[in-house]
Design a protein with these regions (language model features):
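Alpha-helical residues within the helix-turn-helix
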Residues: 83, 100-101
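Residue-level signal for beta-strand positions within conserved beta-sheet cores that form or flank
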Residues: 55, 101, 118-120
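Short recognition helix of helix-turn-helix/winged-helix DNA-binding domains
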Residues: 1-84, 90-91, 115
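A short, conserved structural fragment
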Residues: 101-110
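The DNA-recognition helices of helix-turn-helix-type DNA-binding domains
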Residues: 66, 99, 112
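Short, cationic-aromatic polyanion-contact patches
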Residues: 77, 110-132
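Short, hydrophobic-biased segments on the C-terminal half of alpha helices
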Residues: 93-97
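Charged low-complexity intrinsically disordered patches
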Residues: 1-32, 101, 123-166
Length: 166
């Protein structure tokens, strides 16, 4: 008898290409090809607990959409953010200042010669740090739920009579 080796089927979360294919099924290839942004569910689901109102959340989403590499901050202009979310640039400036004061974002000036500035760079490290406890809470809830379901499944067999043949 021979045994054939079978390659394990990768889980979508461990195979980035599989995850992209799954997202293409949900959103369609055209939308995915036009670009996509990864946002942790915790930030979306716990935005109120994080102190983010809808305007703040939209600003965070625009910054995230322009953040392509972990070690390179995003640098959308205030005008681009304002145009994208349909708010006045003054509103965006105030909200960015509030997000910075609240520790959700870090703004870094990019000066040019002659006293002018390029658009600011933005880091979301404060938001990430602020969301971590909520993510850990969610992970613990899931683990507790799995342990509970496992315990219930093992108890289902209790109380049943097994017929034993002599």
């Amino acid at each position: 008898m021979s045994v054939a080796a079978v390659a394990p089927v990768p889980k979508p979360e461990s195979d980035p290409k599989a995850a992209v294919r799954e997202n293409e099924k949900k959103w369609g290839k055209t939308l995915m090809d036009a670009g996509w942004t990864c946002i942790p569910s915790t930030i979306i689901l716990r935005q109120q607990a994080l102190g983010l109102d809808p305007v703040d959340m939209n600003i965070v989403l625009v910054i995230a959409a322009h953040w392509w590499k972990a070690d390179q901050p995003a640098f959308p202009s205030k005008k681009l953010i304002a145009d994208t979310i349909g708010k006045d640039p003054t509103t965006v400036r105030r909200r960015l200042a509030k997000l910075e004061k609240d520790g959700m974002i870090e703004r870094i000036l990019r000066p040019q010669p002659g006293g002018r500035h390029n658009s600011n760079e933005y880091r979301l490290s404060g938001l990430i740090t602020g969301a971590e406890p909520y993510a850990k809470e969610e992970i613990a809830k899931r683990a507790d739920g799995q342990a509970y379901r496992k315990a219930r499944a093992s108890k289902k067999g209790l109380g049943l009579v097994a017929v034993v043949k002599p």
